[in-house]
UniProtKB/Swiss-Prot annotation:
Start-end of Basic residues biased regions: 435-444
Biased segments, Basic and acidic residues type: 358-387
Protein family according to the UniProt entry: Belongs to the UPF0329 family.
Coiled coil region boundaries: none
Source superkingdom: Eukaryota
Segments for region (Disordered): 358-444
InterPro entries per record: DUF3654, UPF0329
Name listed for the protein in its UniProt record: UPF0329 protein ECU11_0030
């Protein structure tokens, strides 16, 4: 009776409304999909929102371009959820990948010449409809199209004008995608006293309520008393839930929350380094799955907005009580996967405490840096005074050597203080000694074996090429020596196993899911990283693929650093995409080496460096250890409160 329809492709309507045999709810049926629209469900988020939601990112939309109008060919299953208000977030996806960030300007979108026509069409014609479906949705009735005709008459042109007006402003190039979404929501939900009749959305709400009153007062003829009773109960319930449609207070509150969330998302993206933004999107993406009803072909072409579900009153109160930093952290936690139903006043206070502590540490760090700067200036001044005094003396004094020794000691102390900020664990392999502090207990360390196809990359390029050419994997046969040298840079990272086996591994690696291929069940883990080599720095992910041997021990058969842009992080972490590109069959019978016993070939030198938020593997020139050949940095996962 009342519910949300979500379009997939613009076409004639094929979905019909029927009554559910079990609960007498009205059910939309279309192409084999049933959408229960239960009595009392509202067309909005809030008290009784019809939502399809996931922990972090929530899909609800269309193939190719989002058409959240009433012209639909298929329907998508929606889940009744009373936990909060739908708030659209300024991220646009295409398939599994980011198409627009909150900071994206139209000039950035124009770089994708293949997709720009679809993007422009969406912005000019449909973005307002998409937001409408998230925030308001549509009223349906199984016996006639009176509500559709009302929407066409009152709202279709109104929303189209908003889309055209806001898209023109955005396409001038100065606004970000976050500011575009804020404009759309602000104009669509405009209902202040400055607008005649309270604004388009309020006028539409009043018309809907008048139509509901008419249906209650004039039930269809020929009904039995029992049928009439059920009919009146349903429509009175619908009227009760639909009353918010003309609530000026509600729409003003939602518009304010949308503005706060859009601004928070923009600030989050502006304040993050590239690898941190990759981590945020990857962590949220792990908890996002395209709806099962979509085929793989549809999933990869879908263009859609996404939203979070949250108690809008609570979020607004938190913003007023604690300010923008706490609101920004709350939004960040929801992007990382925190569910709106788990966010209450106690959680808000907890987040506020974390933000205060973070600010305190930042202030202490700033104060310490200032003191160090002042100290350095004083030391420099003292050295200069000593030098002047020395030049003023006649001849060489007997104390000169001792002054030089004193300066040398001061320099050594400074270096030791600076070096104390990180824990360095240099390891020389191939029979040489191992340096470092105390050996850690093996408690909590994980067991791994290394497959021969991973160990192969530790050899010389010539030997690698020879073995691949003789092997069974077609993808590697016939590669040139230059290609092998390039691939060795991203595959020869076996030092990562030191981190993978440690008890801290879960702080760095995300579980990217399991799947079966080539007759074995495989598991995949990813971590955000950066590779520095040849004067270049590449951000991306460290991929680890494993299967279990006969004893149940994980065997690492795939290990690689994959350069990854922000726009393609979705494909990198999506199990379906990974499965399709994974090696067809792995020879599980090959002899594997215990990771604890693995050593690099003689002459290779690397060291691992643990810092607060990262783990580094540094490869050095064996002939000159001051020369760094490569550096792989693996970053900690974002903090989830």
């Amino acid at each position: 009776m009342i519910g949300r329809m979500v379009g997939l492709e613009p076409s004639s309507r094929s979905g019909v409304l029927e009554e559910c045999r079990e609960c007498r709810a009205i059910v939309m049926k279309g192409d084999g999909v049933q959408t229960p629209l239960h009595k009392g469900d509202s067309i909005l988020g809030g008290e009784g929102a019809c939502l399809m939601r996931y922990a972090a990112w929530t899909l609800i939309s269309a193939v190719d371009v989002v058409y959240c109008s009433l012209e639909t060919r298929e329907s998508v299953s929606l889940t009744f959820n009373p936990d909060g208000q739908v708030i659209v977030v300024p991220f646009m996806f295409k398939g599994y990948n980011i198409a627009a960030l909150p900071t994206t300007k139209f000039g950035d979108l124009k770089k994708d010449t293949k997709q720009i026509e679809n993007v422009v069409s969406f912005l000019r014609s449909d973005i307002c409809y998409a937001v409408w479906e998230f925030l308001v949705s549509s009223v349906q009735y199984k016996d006639d199209d009176r509500f559709e005709r009302l929407f066409d008459e009152r709202m279709r042109g109104y929303l189209r004008n908003i889309s055209e007006g806001t898209s023109k402003v955005y396409m001038r190039g100065n606004k970000t995608f976050s500011e575009l979404l804020e404009m759309v929501c602000g104009r669509m939900l405009e209902c202040s006293g400055r607008v005649a009749g309270g604004g388009g959305i309020v006028r539409y709400g009043r018309d809907v309520m008048r139509m509901l009153d008419d249906m209650i007062e004039n039930p269809p003829a020929g009904m039995s008393e029992e049928e009439k009773k059920v009919y009146l109960e349903d429509w009175r319930s619908a009227k009760e839930w639909g009353g918010f449609l003309y609530s000026i207070e509600r729409w003003e509150r939602i518009a304010e929350v949308e503005k706060i969330v859009c601004n928070a998302c923009k600030e989050i993206c502006l304040g993050l380094r590239e690898e941190e933004l990759l981590g945020l999107l990857a962590e949220g993406g792990m908890k996002k799955t395209l709806k099962e009803e979509f085929s793989e072909d549809k999933a990869k072409d879908a263009r859609y907005l996404e939203y979070i579900v949250v108690d809008d009153v609570l979020l607004l109160d938190a913003h007023r009580e604690y300010g923008g930093e706490v609101t920004k952290e709350l939004v960040r936690q929801m992007l990382l996967g925190k569910e709106g139903k788990d966010i209450d006043k106690r959680y808000v206070d907890r987040v506020a405490g974390v933000v205060r502590e973070r600010q305190r540490k930042r202030e202490e760090e700033t104060e310490r840096s200032v003191k160090e700067l002042v100290g350095d200036e004083e030391k420099a001044k003292s050295k200069e005074e000593k030098a002047k005094s020395k030049r003023g003396r006649k001849g060489k004094s007997a104390s000169a050597p001792s002054e030089q020794e004193e300066e040398k000691k001061e320099s050594e102390v400074e270096e030791a203080e600076q070096g104390g900020e990180v824990e360095a664990l240099p390891v020389e392999v191939g029979g040489a000694r191992s340096k470092g502090g105390k050996k850690k207990s093996k408690g909590g360390r994980k067991c791994f074996k290394i497959h021969r196809r991973v160990l192969r990359w530790t050899k010389s390029p010539e030997k690698i090429k020879e073995e691949w050419d003789k092997g069974s994997e077609e993808r590697w046969k016939g590669r040139s020596l230059e290609e092998i040298k390039e691939q060795k840079i991203v595959h020869d990272i076996t030092g990562v196993l030191e981190l993978l086996r440690s008890e801290d591994a879960d702080r760095f690696f995300m579980d990217a899911g399991k799947y079966r291929k080539g007759g074995s069940e495989r598991q995949r883990m990813v971590a955000i990283g950066a590779l520095e080599t040849g004067g270049q720095r590449m951000t991306g992910v460290v991929e680890v693929g494993t299967f279990k041997d006969g004893d149940g021990c994980p065997v690492v058969y795939h290990l690689r650093f994959k350069p990854t842009s922000i726009g393609s992080i979705g494909d990198v972490i999506n199990p379906g995409v990974v499965e399709a590109s994974d090696v067809g069959r792995v020879d599980e019978g090959e002899e594997c080496e215990d990771a604890d016993k693995f050593v690099y070939p003689k002459g290779v030198r690397f060291e691992t460096v643990k810092e607060t938020g990262s783990f580094q593997i540094v490869w050095k020139n064996p002939s000159d250890t001051s020369e760094v050949l490569r550096r792989l940095i693996v970053y900690c996962r974002p903090c989830v409160i």
